[in-house]
UniProtKB/Swiss-Prot annotation:
The lineage of its organism: Eukaryota, Viridiplantae, Streptophyta, Embryophyta, Tracheophyta. One of its GO terms (biological process) is proton motive force-driven mitochondrial ATP synthesis. Signal peptide: none annotated. One of its GO terms (cellular component) is proton-transporting ATP synthase complex. Transmembrane segments: none annotated. CDD domains: ATP-synt_F1_beta_C (cd18110), ATP-synt_F1_beta_N (cd18115), F1-ATPase_beta_CD (cd01133). This is ATP synthase subunit beta, chloroplastic. Produces ATP from ADP in the presence of a proton gradient across the membrane. The catalytic sites are hosted primarily by the beta subunits. Keywords: ATP synthesis, ATP-binding, CF(1), Chloroplast, Hydrogen ion transport, Ion transport, Membrane, Nucleotide-binding, Plastid, Thylakoid, Translocase, Transport. SUPFAM superfamilies: C-terminal domain of alpha and beta subunits of F1 ATP synthase, N-terminal domain of alpha and beta subunits of F1 ATP synthase, P-loop containing nucleoside triphosphate hydrolases. It catalyses: ATP + H2O + 4 H(+)(in) = ADP + phosphate + 5 H(+)(out). PANTHER family: ATP SYNTHASE (PTHR15184), ATP SYNTHASE SUBUNIT BETA, MITOCHONDRIAL (PTHR15184:SF71).
Length: 490
């Protein structure tokens, strides 16, 4: 841990100021800097550009290449407007360091760990470098355990692994943000954990909307900021590629502190992991590297691995990561999503069709997958229930064309029963969310895994065949559904 050298020029010590270089070349966000012989900065060191007459420019760069002839090539983390050849550059002697700890909760940061929410400086002296190696093999927690979210459809059909990585696939307006906020809320209540949200190359408007919705739903506590459950780190679309490439590491560094020092379970959201790859591709081209397949950087899998391997469970705590994945032109074989898939333990697919029916969360029960759904991990009872639910829904899907053309009456007795149960299951997979209370007026529900399994077993067994299907819509456990059915009858 060290005092952050990148937040202001005054914090660069007198000793560090001795290692001065000068800008010799500027190409967009890439700078070439000459240093005195024998005083070359290390790869990944942060460099701060001094303005004319000691004016602060606040442009921080990161060393990427040592070129020879006492020159380094660095990538800027902010706009290089106004920089000129001959300007002094200070080698801070360390990588970019960002604030970590409880005081980061409820705040918004940029890639350098500077707060951008107009709420004043962050009350902490503890900082951590954004570049570090993944935990050693001996530190890892190799036990396979389920990360219970309290969301029925996720826990039953595509359970998350503690310390795992989940890909979240969904277009605009299908409830991705609400699902993210509910997970942030539930991890705080059920696991006493915190969340870090990394907005990587996303629209400024979306980041602003998410912040306002989090304040409205109580995930960020405006009255008492330290009581908030999430820290936000943004590197928006309009920022240089260096910032977008490193903002994921800034968010991960904050999450690692909660895991390693506070020994908490942490939820890390990255939206969007594709933008991380895209920014790396831009930087790679600017550094003059030969492009690889489809124009991506030759170091694609190395860069992805260095980020993903740090997201893991140790004996102290866990980082469970949920990553939104954009698939360019819906081509799953594109190198960017294909490299991401290699690291994912589960996929949660949001369906526009379910959202149109009003079934929220609109998680597609047949498209969502998880490596954890195995009898030896989740147990026979859970596995059997999940498989029977999927079989029932799959049969219903197959019958929908016949129903649309001929109607329900033309089906066999057995198929009619399957359709009736599938419609109950479909509705029972919906659930009222805590963070949506402000919009829906119905109180949120956290449903434990055992309760979820019991509910679906009762529907599959036929014990609840006599209840109307609307009784299963937007309820928590199965007892609420039976109580709702009694109310509907009266």
């Amino acid at each position: 841990m060290r005092i952050n050298p990148t937040t202001s020029g005054s914090e660069v010590s007198a000793v560090e100021k001795k290692n001065l270089g000068r800008i010799v070349k500027i190409i967009g966000p890439v700078l070439d800097v000459a240093f005195p012989p024998g005083k070359m900065p290390n790869i990944y060191n942060a460099l701060v550009v001094q303005g004319r007459d000691n004016e602060q420019t606040n442009v921080t760069c990161e060393v990427q290449q040592l070129l020879g002839n006492n020159r380094v090539r660095a990538v800027a983390m902010s706009d290089t407007d106004g920089l000129m050849r001959g300007m002094e550059v200070i080698d801070t002697g360390a990588p970019i360091s960002v604030p970590v700890g409880g005081s980061t909760l409820g705040r918004i940061f940029n890639v350098l760990g500077q707060p951008v929410d107009n709420l004043g400086p962050v009350d902490t002296n503890t900082t951590s470098p954004i570049h570090r190696s993944a935990p050693a093999f001996i530190q890892l927690d190799t036990k396979l355990s389920i990360f219970e979210t309290g969301i029925k459809v996720v826990d039953l059909l595509a359970p998350y692994r503690r310390g795992g990585k989940i890909g979240l696939f969904g277009g605009a307006g299908v409830g991705k943000t609400v699902l993210i906020m509910e997970l942030i809320n539930n991890i705080a209540k059920a696991h006493g954990g915190v969340s870090v949200f990394g907005g990587v190359g996303e629209r400024t408007r979306e980041g602003n909307d998410l912040y306002l919705e989090m304040k409205e739903s109580g995930v960020i506590n405006e009255e008492n900021i330290p009581e908030s459950k999430v820290a936000l780190v943004y590197g928006q679309m309009n920022e240089p590629p260096g910032a977008r490439m490193r903002v994921g590491l800034t968010a991960l560094t904050m999450a690692e502190y909660f895991r390693d020092v506070n020994e908490q379970d942490v939820l890390l959201f990255i939206d969007n992991i594709f933008r991380f790859v895209q920014a790396g591709s831009e930087v790679s081209a600017l550094l003059g590297r030969m492009p690889s397949a489809v124009g991506y950087q030759p170091t694609l899998s190395t860069e992805m691995g260095s980020l993903q391997e740090r997201i893991t469970s140790t004996k102290e705590g866990s980082i469970t990561s949920i990553q939104a994945v954009y698939v360019p032109a819906d081509d799953l074989t594109d190198p960017a999503p294909a490299t991401t898939f290699a690291h994912l333990d589960a996929t949660t697919v949001l369906s526009r069709g379910l959202a149109a029916k009003g079934i929220y969360p609109a998680v597609d029960p047949l498209d969502s997958t998880s490596t954890m759904l195995q009898p030896r991990i989740v147990g026979e009872e859970h596995y059997e229930t999940a498989q029977r639910v999927k079989q029932t829904l799959q049969r219903y899907k197959e019958l929908q064309d016949i129903i649309a053309i001929l109607g329900l009456d033309e089906l066999s007795e057995e198929d009619r029963l399957t359709v009736a149960r599938a419609r109950k299951i479909e509705r029972f997979l919906s659930q009222p969310f805590f963070v949506a209370e402000v919009f829906t007026g119905s109180p949120g529900k956290y449903v434990g895994l055992a309760e979820t399994i019991r509910g679906f077993q009762l529907i599959l067994s036929g014990e609840l065949d006599g209840l109307p299907e609307q009784a299963f819509y937007l309820v928590g456990n199965i007892d609420e559904a039976t109580a709702k059915a009694m109310n509907l009858k009266t």
